[in-house]
């Protein structure tokens, strides 16, 4: 069986100018123009300009010495430990918008392997931080708003997708869910940023386990405009109209999805209201 192991992959890479100082403090990373400056300050590697219109900026660490970063949204932040790599994305045609996407690969634990109990402790620490820093549950605008009472049912039936951020699994529940899914998935937002977290168990035997975490941050300005075809060619009035059409279409799709989920025994959280992303899109 092939096991995903970013520790081993990273260790096999040749040394590069982009390897980070292993003893540095937490690196602050922002979106927008400040984000470009953050990457430039902490990396000697040139921007990777791709023909498809995306510019990539990266930071890397060599295990076993891993990094720490703090990613800032408009209103909060998230601190990430045991970081292996950070990839920041700038849209070339909208270069003045700066960094719009950040993908971060990290280990859940500081050593290459850990125990189930230690991994569980690290999971609870992550969930506490999510709540303490007021990240909120995010449903994609076309997806069903599943009620919190169906959290465990939803996790086991959808490969670990969490819908109640305030609920911390017991150790037994943690073991039971992972035995069925091998992962947990969080969909969050805070201010101008949406965040997907995928926590995966990548190895397990009788003595040790390994967990990797992917943090995918996306600015709502990019996400909103990217959902609209040719948004860059529109004036402000056309963009507003296209955005409203997109919202209406999403509502129709959501209604259909929620009706389907009700047939499967799920409850819908009618109180959930989508974040207003228009101020960021326009």
PLM features: residue spans?
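Long, charged/polar, surface-exposed segments that mediate recognition or autoinhibition
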Residues: 85-165, 181, 207-244, 248
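Bacterial signal peptide processing site
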Residues: 12-15
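C-terminal interaction module
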Residues: 170, 176-282
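Sec-dependent signal peptide recognition
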Residues: 1-4
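C-terminal motif of bacterial Sec signal peptides marking the signal peptidase cleavage site
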Residues: 8-10
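Compositionally biased, flexible interaction segments
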Residues: 47-88, 105-108, 114-115, 122, ...
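Ser/Thr-rich, low-complexity intrinsically disordered terminal regions
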Residues: 25-28, 37-78, 139-191, 233, ...
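Amphipathic alpha-helical segments
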Residues: 21-23, 30-48, 117-141
């Amino acid at each position: 069986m092939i096991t995903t192991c970013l520790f081993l992959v990273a260790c096999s890479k040749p040394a590069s100018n982009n390897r980070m100082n292993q003893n540095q403090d937490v690196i602050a990373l922002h979106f927008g123009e400040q984000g470009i400056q953050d990457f430039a300050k902490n990396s000697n590697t040139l921007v990777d300009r791709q023909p498809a219109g995306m510019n990539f900026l990266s930071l890397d660490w060599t295990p076993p010495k891993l990094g720490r970063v703090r990613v800032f949204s408009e209103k909060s932040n998230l601190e990430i430990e045991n970081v292996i790599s950070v990839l920041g994305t700038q849209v070339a045609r909208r270069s003045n918008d700066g960094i719009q996407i950040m993908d971060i690969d990290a280990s859940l634990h500081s050593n290459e392997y850990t125990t189930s109990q230690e991994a569980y402790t690290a999971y609870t620490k992550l969930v506490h931080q999510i709540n303490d820093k007021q990240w909120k549950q995010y449903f994609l605008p076309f997806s069903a708003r599943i009620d919190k009472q169906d959290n465990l049912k939803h996790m086991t039936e959808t490969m670990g997708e969490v819908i109640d951020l305030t609920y911390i699994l017991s150790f037994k529940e943690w073991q039971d869910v992972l035995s069925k899914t091998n992962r947990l998935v969080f969909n969050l937002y805070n201010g101008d940023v949406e965040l997907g977290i995928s926590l995966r168990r990548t190895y397990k035997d009788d003595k040790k386990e390994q967990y990797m975490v992917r943090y995918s941050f996306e600015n709502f300005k990019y996400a909103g405009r990217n959902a609209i075809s040719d948004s860059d060619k529109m004036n402000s009035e056309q963009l507003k109209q296209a955005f409203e059409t997109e919202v209406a279409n999403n509502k129709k799709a959501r209604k259909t999805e929620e009706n389907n989920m009700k047939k499967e025994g799920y409850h819908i959280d009618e109180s959930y209201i989508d974040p207003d992303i228009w101020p960021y899109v326009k």
